[in-house]
Structure formats: C-alpha cells, structure tokens
C-alpha cells in the first residue's frame, strides 16, 4: 500500500532532520540517509514504475558496458567535451549509435551534456576510467557473470539440486559452453577474462579493524615459537601487511607471519614488498603443514565454494590447529532475516555465488558448516557498515 500524503511529508521532514545531523565526510551517516531516501522512494512509486526502473537499470548497465568496452570513457578523459561524431571516429563505430548510448547515460545524470551530441565526464563516470581505486574491473567481472545470469532460469528448470552444487556444472560453466570445468578453469581459457578477474580481486577489500589482533599480544609473547598468522590463499599478502602494522610487527617477537598461496601467485610477489612475511606454496585442499599456529586466516575464500568443498578446505586447517588456535574467516555474514532497504552488497555477491558455485552464509549456516569439521563458532565480529564480518572459530571442546 502506498504511503499517504501526510506520511510522505513526515518522512521528508525526518530525512531533512537526518541530513542536518551529517558532519563532514560522514560516510556511514550518508549511507543511512540513502537507505531512508530509497525506502521513501519505494513507498511513493506506483507498482508499474518498479518494472520501468528495472528496465532502466538493465539498459543503463548495457550502455555502461558498451562505453567501457569501446573505450569511450577513456577517450573522454581530460577533455572539456567531445562529440558523438568524434567518439565514433576514435572507436570506429557509427556516431548515431554513440549518440543513442550517450543519451541514456546523460538522462541518468551519469555523463554531462555539453550541447547537442557533446559530452563530458562527471565524478560518477570517472569511476569507470581505468586506474587505481576505480570500479571498472569489478564492473567488467559482473559483465562476464551477467552472461550466466540470463541462463539461470533455464538451468534451474532443467538441472537437479545436486548439479547446482557440482563445481563442474555451475551456471557459469554451462552458459559459456564448458560444462565439466570449474569456474576458475573456465576463466583460465580466456586470458582477458582471467585478467579481469585478477584485477577485480586486487581492488579494495573488506573493511579492516573488525578483529582485535592487539588482544592476542599476551598469548604471542608467551609462546613466540608458534607461528602467529597463517594466511591461507592470502593473495599478495595485503592482510598480513595490515596485521603486521596493527601489531607492531608481531609485538616485537620472532613469531612468523606465513603467506600460503599457489606457486604462480607467490612468484609474482617481490619479497621486499612483504618484508617479515614468509612465502609458502600451498594448496588448501591438502594437509596443512603449519601446526599449532595462533591464527589460521581465510579471507574471501570460503564463500567461493559449496558446503562439501568448504568442508574439505576447513578440515585441513582444523587438523593442524592446537587447543588455543583460532580460525578466522573474513566473509559477509548474512542476517537471519533479510535487511529491507539496507545494503545490497552481500545479497548481490551471494547471487554471484549462485552462478559460480559458491554462496554467502548466515551465522547459523557458518556454525553448522564449522561443526561438521570439528570446529565451533566462538563469535562473529561485525564491521561498522554492510555485512562485512570475521567469523572466529576454535576446535570443539570436549
């Protein structure tokens, strides 16, 4: 039921009050304000407009995809304005097509209009220009995944529940005609697709500071001979560098920080860039060679796989843990009840998992998964925003 006129006025006044409370660059406050605005918009818009908005979103996505892949945003960079004809000549595409794409982007206030068929960047479109701290690589990855999104309805109608959790029969693999290969094997068949994935993974990760590593000082000082943190599948060591910084280089002890990754990943890392960190080739489906570390650390790994694969990964770590070892899993933790009007990030990533064979989990689902490999959930350390969290687990107590 739509909100009444009186309710609309009251909520706008509430929005105004919230806006007046904002101080400086208060990102969390702005996020809360956006949530209120979005909820009001949904209550005011007529039902048929929901379809129109979805149609608009699909077309908008397609136009951004075209602009990125043709290099339009790159050619616009550094110019006060550029015409459709000039862009068309630069990318060898009919200028009428360029104009039609740009109309959608201008109407969405994403690109600025500088006269008839002339355009310029806005602060929003610049986010899609190649470079550090931009969204272009993540967008390109979602564009690859979108191919499988379109095929999921037919996949679900024709496949069994067991096939959905078979990592060699994912919607992504089937959409690209490569059933029998895992998501990562499909990616590896196309160097451009693999490069897109690797680039998107190097973009800013989850919120930091959720788990108090400083609280482990006493334990580490008491037993410095034990490895401090084993980062399993830790990429280029970004997390260990942050932990190193937070703990004053492991509280001044000789306790190790160990980065475990595939050999090909480790070969790309200059040891000088991760001073004080030990590189160790490792496949997390095999027996964990480092025993009784203070912390075993997984960041953005577990959500890439269905439960039966996660059990195989986690039992390797559990088999190496000592009585006081901790297992930390950096993941989104979904609320037990869906958060209406809140941040969509975790739900969007969960749908990515549906396509590629993984999933996001609730606290209850994490507890169940951990229990199957002899671990127990101790605590979920939540971040300030969104659904970012660290799941802490230990060996089950007798």
From Swiss-Prot:
Cystine bridges: none
Observed effect of gene inactivation: Leads to a reduced production of hypothemycin but an increased production of 4-O-desmethylhypothemycin.
Origin superkingdom: Eukaryota
Pathway: Secondary metabolite biosynthesis
Keyword Methyltransferase in record: yes
Active site (UniProt): 303 (proton acceptor)
Applied biotechnology uses: Hypothemycin is an antifungal agent that exhibits excellent activity against Peronophythora litchii, which could be helpful for the storage of harvest litchi fruit. Hypothemycin is a strong inhibitor of a subset of MAP kinases such as human ERK2. It can therefore be used as an anti-cancer drug thanks to its inhibitory activity of Ras-mediated cellular signals. It can also inhibit Trypanosoma brucei kinase TbCLK1 which is a good candidate as a therapeutic target for African trypanosomiasis. Finally, hypothemycin also has inhibitor activity of T cell activation.
GO biological process: methylation; secondary metabolite biosynthetic process
InterPro entries with a match to the protein in the record: COMT-like, O_MeTrfase_dom, Plant_O-MeTrfase_dimerisation, SAM-dependent_MTases_sf, WH-like_DNA-bd_sf, WH_DNA-bd_sf
Keywords (A to Z) from UniProt: Methyltransferase, S-adenosyl-L-methionine, Transferase
EC number of the protein: 2.1.1.-
UniProt binding sites for S-adenosyl-L-methionine: 233-234, 261, 283-284
Top enzyme class: transferase
Pfam families: Dimerisation, Methyltransf_2
Molecular function (Gene Ontology), one example: protein dimerization activity
Biological function: O-methyltransferase; part of the gene cluster that mediates the biosynthesis of hypothemycin, a resorcylic acid lactone (RAL) that irreversibly inhibits a subset of protein kinases with a conserved cysteine in the ATP binding site such as human ERK2. The first step is performed by both PKSs hmp3 and hmp8 and leads to the production of 7',8'-dehydrozearalenol (DHZ). The highly reducing PKS hpm8 synthesizes the reduced hexaketide (7S,11S,2E,8E)-7,11-dihydroxy-dodeca-2,8-dienoate, which is transferred downstream to the non-reducing PKS hpm3.
PANTHER family associated with the record: PUTATIVE (AFU_ORTHOLOGUE AFUA_4G14240)-RELATED (PTHR43712:SF18), PUTATIVE (AFU_ORTHOLOGUE AFUA_4G14580)-RELATED (PTHR43712)
Family assignment from sequence similarity: Belongs to the class I-like SAM-binding methyltransferase superfamily. Cation-independent O-methyltransferase family.
Name of the protein this chain belongs to: O-methyltransferase hmp5
Native species: Hypomyces subiculosus (Nectria subiculosa)
């Amino acid at each position: 039921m739509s909100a009444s006129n009186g309710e609309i006025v009251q909520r706008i006044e509430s929005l105004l009050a919230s806006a007046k409370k904002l101080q400086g660059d208060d990102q969390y406050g702005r996020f809360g304000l956006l949530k209120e605005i979005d909820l009001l918009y949904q209550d005011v818009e007529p039902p048929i407009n929901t379809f129109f908005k979805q149609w608009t979103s699909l077309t908008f996505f397609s136009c951004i995809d075209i602009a990125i892949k043709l290099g339009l945003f790159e050619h616009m960079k550094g110019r006060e304005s550029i015409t459709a004809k000039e862009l068309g000549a630069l990318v060898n595409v009919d200028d009428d097509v360029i104009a039609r794409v740009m109309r959608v982007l201008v109407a969405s206030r994403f690109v600025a209009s500088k006269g008839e068929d002339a355009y310029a960047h806005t602060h929003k479109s610049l986010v899609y220009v190649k470079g550090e701290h931009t969204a272009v690589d993540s967008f390109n990855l979602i564009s690859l995944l979108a191919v499988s999104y379109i095929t999921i309805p037919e996949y679900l109608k024709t496949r069994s529940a067991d096939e959905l959790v078979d990592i060699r029969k994912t919607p992504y693999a089937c959409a690209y005609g490569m059933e029998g290969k895992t998501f990562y094997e499909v990616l590896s068949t196309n160097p451009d697709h693999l490069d897109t994935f690797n680039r998107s993974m190097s973009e800013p990760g989850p919120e930091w500071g959720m788990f108090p590593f400083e609280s482990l000082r006493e334990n580490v000082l008491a037993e410095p001979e034990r490895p401090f943190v084993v980062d399993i599948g830790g990429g280029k060591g970004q997390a260990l560098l942050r932990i190193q910084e937070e703990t004053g280089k492991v509280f001044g002890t000789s306790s190790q920080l160990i980065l475990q990754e595939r050999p090909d990943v480790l070969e790309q890392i200059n040891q000088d860039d991760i001073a004080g960190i030990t590189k160790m080739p490792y496949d997390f489906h095999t027996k964990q060679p480092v025993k009784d570390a203070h912390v075993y650390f997984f960041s953005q790994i577990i959500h890439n796989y269905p439960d039966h694969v996660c059990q195989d990964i986690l039992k390797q770590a559990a088999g190496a843990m000592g009585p006081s070892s901790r297992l930390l899993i950096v993941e989104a933790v979904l609320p037990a009840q869906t958060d209406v009007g809140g941040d969509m990030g975790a739900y969007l990533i969960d749908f990515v998992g549906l396509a590629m064979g993984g999933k996001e989990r609730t606290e209850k689902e994490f507890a169940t998964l951990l229990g199957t490999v002899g671990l127990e959930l101790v605590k979920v350390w939540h971040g300030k925003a969104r659904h970012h969290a660290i799941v802490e687990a230990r060996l089950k107590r007798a």
